[in-house]
């Protein structure tokens, strides 16, 4: 009997307070890497009513204006008036509390130091990569459309077409699966911060017509699709005034929307020596190439590291019964075609560049921007040939 179920994923806008924090942390990371590609960065941001705090550990030769970067990032998102929006990059108090990277950690990461003379992992941990055939970019459908809805919302807000819209927003997409294949969108939830002078009917009509129907293909929608637009009825107070925001609190939004697994490590504000970020990007690259090669319809890879050690503790591939080869054989292909040591990951994906602010909203995966090397499928042909397909 065909398996019939619903699966939902959410996204948030660039104006959501947690995403604001992610973007500030990654804007700082980019500025540091632009001057000193070997910067060691662990930058955490918190935003709340009237202020922004930047903390963490940074070792760098770069000299940057942390406050200026934070203010510019906040204003670019759209928080430009404390009077009308409750928050502004121009008037928020910016606190900076930074230290250097621990020398104990550094000796395990610096090449030629510590017990393993190769560049070791910046921490222990488990990282996952995932890909599937549900969309052209090999991402799960629910998170893919949840992100696209938020991108469209921001586009129309900034152009003035949604004149009432303000930066804070969230989306959620529920997809029906039959035999593990997506067949329809059953529900869409969008909550958008708005000006106090617009009525709910206008918000509902414009979100459905200008955002949802512009993004989700008509063949996926049907008469029974449910739309929940600002279901509380009012969303005037938003952004950092409505909720405090902190770097690294949207890790499922950042990845696969709850489909597949997550090792728990956040991305934003971390330089590529942190395997939380670089190995998760590599995992996406590996999984996407396996699926692009036709070795499986769905693929998840887990990689584990120990701090200061270059070689992974373990590598595991799961194709959920969709593989053309058994999972053990695909795991061996991965070990043959991909070097999973931290320094090799940085080199293969060219990660010592100021490319991270773009990743900090609307998903780190599934957007085929030129800078996002982990979205390339340049290993697919070699994998397919080696598999004998």
Curated annotation (Swiss-Prot):
Stretches for region Flexible loop: 101-111
Residues annotated as binding K(+): 44
Cofactor(s) listed in the protein's UniProt record: Mg(2+); K(+)
Entry EC number(s): 2.5.1.6
Enzyme class: transferase
The keyword Transferase is annotated on this UniProt entry: yes
One GO biological process term: one-carbon metabolic process
Record GO cellular component, one term: cytoplasm
Record-linked Gene3D superfamilies: 3.30.300.10
One Pfam family of this chain: S-AdoMet_synt_C
Residues where Mg(2+) binds: 18
Reported function: Catalyzes the formation of S-adenosylmethionine (AdoMet) from methionine and ATP. The overall synthetic reaction is composed of two sequential steps, AdoMet formation and the subsequent tripolyphosphate hydrolysis which occurs prior to release of AdoMet from the enzyme.
HAMAP family from the UniProt entry: S_AdoMet_synth1
NCBIfam families: metK
Subunit structure: Homotetramer; dimer of dimers.
Protein name in UniProt: S-adenosylmethionine synthase
Organism, as annotated: Magnetococcus marinus (strain ATCC BAA-1437 / JCM 17883 / MC-1)
Higher taxonomy: Bacteria, Pseudomonadati, Pseudomonadota, Alphaproteobacteria, Magnetococcales
Gene (name only): metK
């Amino acid at each position: 009997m065909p398996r019939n179920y619903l699966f939902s994923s959410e996204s948030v806008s660039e104006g959501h307070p947690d995403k604001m924090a992610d973007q500030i942390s990654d804007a700082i990371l980019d500025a540091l890497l632009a001057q000193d590609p070997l910067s060691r960065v662990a930058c955490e941001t918190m935003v709340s009513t009237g202020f922004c705090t930047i903390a963490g550990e940074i070792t760098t030769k770069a000299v940057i204006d942390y406050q200026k970067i934070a203010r510019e990032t906040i204003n670019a998102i759209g928080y430009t008036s404390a009077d009308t929006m409750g928050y502004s990059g121009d008037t928020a108090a910016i606190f900076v509390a930074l230290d250097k990277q621990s020398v104990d950690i550094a000796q395990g990461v610096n090449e030629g130091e510590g017990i393993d003379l190769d560049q070791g992992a910046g921490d222990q941990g488990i990282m996952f990569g995932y890909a599937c055939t549900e969309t052209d970019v090999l991402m799960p459908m629910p998170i893919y459309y949840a992100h696209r809805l938020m991108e469209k919302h921001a586009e129309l807000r900034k152009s003035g077409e949604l004149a009432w819209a303000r930066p804070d927003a969230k989306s959620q997409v529920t997809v029906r699966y039959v035999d593990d294949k997506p067949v329809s969108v059953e529900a869409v939830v969008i909550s958008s911060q708005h000006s106090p002078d617009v009525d709910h009917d206008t918000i509902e009509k414009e979100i459905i017509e200008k955002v949802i129907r512009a993004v989700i293909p008509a063949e996926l929608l049907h008469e029974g699709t449910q739309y929940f637009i600002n279901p509380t009825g009012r969303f005037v107070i938003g952004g950092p005034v409505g909720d405090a925001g902190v770097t690294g609190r949207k890790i499922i939004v950042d990845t696969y929307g709850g489909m597949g697994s997550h090792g728990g490590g956040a991305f934003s504000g971390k330089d590529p020596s942190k395997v939380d970020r670089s190995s998760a990007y590599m995992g996406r690259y590996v999984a996407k190439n396996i699926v692009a090669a036709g070795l499986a319809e769905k693929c998840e890879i887990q990689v584990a590291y120990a701090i200061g050690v270059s070689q992974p503790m373990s590598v595991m591939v799961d194709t959920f019964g969709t593989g053309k080869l058994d999972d053990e054989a695909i795991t061996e292909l991965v070990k043959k075609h991909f070097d999973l040591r931290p320094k090799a990951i940085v080199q293969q994906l060219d990660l010592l560049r100021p490319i991270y602010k773009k990743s900090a909203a609307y998903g780190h995966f599934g957007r085929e921007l030129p800078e996002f090397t982990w979205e390339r499928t340049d290993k697919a042909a070699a994998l397919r040939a080696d598999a004998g397909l």
